[in-house]
Amino acid sequence: MPQSPIPTTEVIIAADCWQDQPDAEDVIHRAILAAAERVDAEVGDAEIAVMLTDDAGIRTLNSNWRGIDKPTNVLSFPALQPTGPRGDDDAPRMLGDIAIAYETMRREADEEQKPFDHHLSHLTVHGFLHLIGYDHESDAEAEEMEALETEILAHLGVPDPYADRERLD
């Protein structure tokens, strides 16, 4: 039987503010599935943890891990995996963690006049791509990552999140 392309995804609700978004977990699972299928990543045997937190929680993470003492919308923490064969072929490998901040995400969605679920899909796809090695440190990397995000989101019925700003040249 072929392996599922979607990693096992555990969604952890770490802040009560997420309680008014009962569909958040389904949105996250759909976004990760769409991203994994599009990039044809071999992640079906992997695990991801997605923590739904608040601005205070993500500010602490951002400060501790990046030295930036302010909240942000999403953080990704790729797991460091050995490049050789694993010792236990039956044990799932950890792909990494994603943290998403409710208040920052809500504010951005409101400011950009986009549905909350669309913005959650975008941040989930963005975080997943970081876990599998994509980045946006250079203009070329950003252009590649944004184009991939836009393509994945289109399959989910989410409009291009970058349409209202100039593309990088």
From Swiss-Prot:
GO MF entries: metalloendopeptidase activity; RNA endonuclease activity; zinc ion binding
Cofactor info, note text: Binds 1 zinc ion.
Subcellular location: Cytoplasm
Record keywords, A-Z: Cytoplasm, Endonuclease, Hydrolase, Metal-binding, Nuclease, Ribosome biogenesis, rRNA processing, Zinc
E.C. designation(s): 3.1.-.-
InterPro entries given in the database record: MetalPrtase_cat_dom_sf_prd (IPR023091), YbeY (IPR002036), YbeY_CS (IPR020549)
Cofactor section: Zn(2+)
Chain positions recorded as Zn(2+) binding sites: H126, H130, H136
Chief place where the protein resides: cytoplasm
Residue runs in coiled coils: none
Gene3D superfamilies reported for this sequence: Metalloproteases ('zincins'), catalytic domain
Cited NCBIfam families: rRNA maturation RNase YbeY
Reported function: Single strand-specific metallo-endoribonuclease involved in late-stage 70S ribosome quality control and in maturation of the 3' terminus of the 16S rRNA.
Sequence similarity: Belongs to the endoribonuclease YbeY family.
Stated name of the protein: Endoribonuclease YbeY
Species of provenance: Bradyrhizobium sp. (strain BTAi1 / ATCC BAA-1182)
